[in-house]
Amino acid sequence: QVSVHGGHLASNLGTVELTMALHAVMNFPEDKLIFDVGHQSYTHKILTGRKDAFETLRQYDGLSGFPKRNESPCDAFDTGHSSTGISAAMGYSIARDLSGGDEKVAVVIGDGSLTGGMAYEALNGLAQLKTGCVVVINDNNMSIGKNVGGLSKYLNEIRLGNAYNELKTGVESSLMGSKTGKKIAKVLKRSKDNIKQFFVPGMFFEELGITYVGPIDGHDINQMITTFQHAFRLDKPIIIHVKTKKGKGYGYAERHPDYFHGIAPFDRISGKVLAAKKTSCYTDIFAKKMVKLGE
């Protein structure tokens, strides 16, 4: 349908598996999934009962190219501007906590949107409030940090495990009960931070006070499902860094992701944009009317 009416192709092709993995562990419309900017929400729309209406995408009275609350209860937030998604997710998380709910809250934000100050303001808020929220960084361009082999993967699994987190909490509580224990806890934390600095690529987020996991393959559904399941169980702010490829599955879009980011109607075989139908723009109509009135 994107080839017929135009739209955001490369970004959506790059997040198909990611969206499917989130849907596998979330329950809609009870759970809340927010797409920062929102132009990568096509798969979400198809999976939430709008498949048959997809041919109306970006048409008058048809499906919007972005999430819309008045279009479906599964769209939690009307996005369109960048860097606002984490703030919205934090708001949903706090509202859930205050009302005694148990719904899952997640936000998908691109690496480009992390250039906006509002995103970091929200991350700082999440770290302070300690509310359960999963922030998925869809990294399809900027290298936030490279995986350090199998050891990094092993550390990710340990830090998401219940046994590790329960033991960590118990040891901290015991040590903080005495003056000597507090000194020991301080030394242990310093040692842990030094180790993480070397092995954990998202140390910046860890310094904020948010658990970081990744990078993981954004096209490996099983790995993402397992990671998301563990993350939601921990009930605290967690950043999951996934690496994706814009335009995944369509050769032209993979090779020219910027060109196919937002594209006019095109031929799927050749990848070339179709000649636009000649229509009069507002300026043309205005000029003709003024000439006619002056005659």
Cite the ranges covered by each PLM segment.
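N-terminal amphipathic, basic-rich helices that act as targeting or association modules
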Residues: Q1-T48, F204-F228, L234-V242
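Glycine- and acidic
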Residues: Q1-G7, E71-D78, I210-G214, G271-A276, ...
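A short alpha/beta connector and helix-capping loop motif
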Residues: G116-N138, S152-G161, A253
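Hydrophobic anchor at the start of a short beta-strand
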Residues: V105, C133-V134, Y212, I238
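Long, well-ordered, tryptophan-enriched scaffold segments
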Residues: N140-K289
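Cofactor-binding active-site loop characterized by glycine-rich and histidine/acidic residues
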Residues: H8-L129, Y282-E295
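Generic secondary-structure signature for well-ordered alpha-helical cores
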Residues: S3, G7, A24-F28, D52, ...
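Short beta-strand segments
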Residues: D36, V108-I109, V134-N138, H241-K245
